[in-house]
């Protein structure tokens, strides 16, 4: 049993060390983009067809910053609120070449796994697989600590 645990620990550390070299540093978000919230909302619609070209790094940077970036560097607070300010939501970026975790503090993507996992996160919807990027938002409930107490606080 100890050998298995040691082997797993070595594997985790080697994967972490390998992934540390696989970072995409994002450009600073463009806070001067034109357009209004009302225009964006009025033009919002669903589609089942996606352009085959990749999203450029600047657009991806802006999208990630808007979704969960840090907009108050003095406090580390985000563009999106979170319950009890636990910052429980992580954004994963799934691209044809690999899956990445968005690191808001350093505004970069950290490789989690190489390979195309868009089909795995498509939820059985074949048309989603052709999208050049998928964003997966995951809530890490462990950040609330004592979940019974956190649930009581959240639900009143």
What are these regions (language model features)?
Residues 143-147:
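Short acidic/His/Gly/Ser-rich catalytic and metal-binding motifs that mark active-site loops
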Residues 1-4:
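Positively charged n-region of N-terminal signal peptides that target proteins for export
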Residues 20-131:
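N-terminal amphipathic, basic helical "cap/leader" segment at the start of enzyme domains
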Residues 137-142:
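Glycine-rich, acidic and aromatic/proline-enriched surface loops and short helix-turn segments
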Residues 10-19:
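Hydrophobic h-region of N-terminal signal peptides that target proteins for export
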Residues 149-156:
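Short pre-catalytic strand/loop immediately N-terminal to key active-site residues, enriched for Gly-Thr
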């Amino acid at each position: 049993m100890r050998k298995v645990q040691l082997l797993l620990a070595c594997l985790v550390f080697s994967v972490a060390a390998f992934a540390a070299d696989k970072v995409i540093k994002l450009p600073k978000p463009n806070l001067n983009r034109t357009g209004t919230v009302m225009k964006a909302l009025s033009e919002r619609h669903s589609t089942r067809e996606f352009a085959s070209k990749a999203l450029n790094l600047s657009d991806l940077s802006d999208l990630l910053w808007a979704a969960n970036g840090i907009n108050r560097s003095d406090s580390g607070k985000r563009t999106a609120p979170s319950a009890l300010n636990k910052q429980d939501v992580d954004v994963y970026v799934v691209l044809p070449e690999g899956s990445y975790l968005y690191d808001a503090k350093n505004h970069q993507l950290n490789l989690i796994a190489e390979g195309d996992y868009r089909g795995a996160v498509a939820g059985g919807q074949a048309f989603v697989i052709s999208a050049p990027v998928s964003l997966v938002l995951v809530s890490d409930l462990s950040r609330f600590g004592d979940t019974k107490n956190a649930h009581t606080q959240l639900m009143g």
